[in-house]
Design a protein with these regions (language model features):
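Short S/T/G/P-rich N-terminal loop/turn motif that feeds into the first structured element of a domain
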Residues: 1-157, 177-193
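Outer-membrane beta-barrel domain signature
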Residues: 158-167, 171-172, 176
Length: 193
């Protein structure tokens, strides 16, 4: 089933926690944690049956995507009180399909090398809005913030294999440098409840 995620940036002074509480029917609506990059103030995640983007005077900007999973897995289904991370990215137009599939395959292999990724899903976007025409959503769950900011960010597989797709100085570069890296706390797993 298709999924919907929105990274919502609020007007200065807006109450993030109150806004999240008033969102309504969602799988996840949480304020982002410090350290996000173009990741908004709030992450909203729900099933595609309701892909309506919230409309409110408190909203300054939204990056969102409707997407279909192409792969994923679970090392810890039912994870509780962890950290959900969402990366919206755009593969450059004209990239050969075989290259895109290699990028997807190497991204999906990350949890086999980075043990702090507890649950994960990679998806292709079917409908996007915001700063870019997003093509992929890469979601992960961690037991704590240290798993994301430590082992995930510093693992050699990440830097030696996957990062070359994101680095304009590498010949394999295919991902637009403007991306949305966002994360928040959750009470109950979003990816594998």
């Amino acid at each position: 089933m298709a999924k919907f995620t929105a990274l919502i940036t609020l007007q200065p002074g807006a109450d993030r926690a109150a806004f999240a509480r008033n969102i309504g029917d969602t799988t996840l609506a949480q304020p982002t944690l410090p350290g996000v990059f173009d990741g908004g103030d709030l992450i909203l995640h729900r099933q595609v049956a309701n892909e309506a983007v919230p409309s409110d005077a408190a909203i300054a900007h939204i990056d969102s995507a409707v997407y279909e999973p192409i792969g994923g897995g679970a090392h810890e289904p039912g994870l509780r009180n962890g950290v959900y991370r969402c990366l919206l990215l755009a593969v450059k137009p004209g990239t050969p399909e075989a290259t895109v599939r290699q990028f997807e395959s190497e991204t999906l292999a990350m949890p086999h090398y980075i043990g702090t990724i507890r649950n994960w899903r990679l998806s292709r976007v079917t409908k996007a809005s915001g700063a870019r025409v997003w093509t992929h959503v890469w979601e992960q769950e961690y037991a704590d913030i240290g798993g994301l900011l430590g082992p995930y960010m510093t693992n050699p597989y990440h830097w030696a294999r996957v990062d070359r797709w994101f680095d304009p100085e590498c010949p394999e570069w295919i991902v637009d440098t403007r991306l949305c890296h966002s994360f928040c706390a959750f009470e109950r797993s979003v990816l594998n409840p």
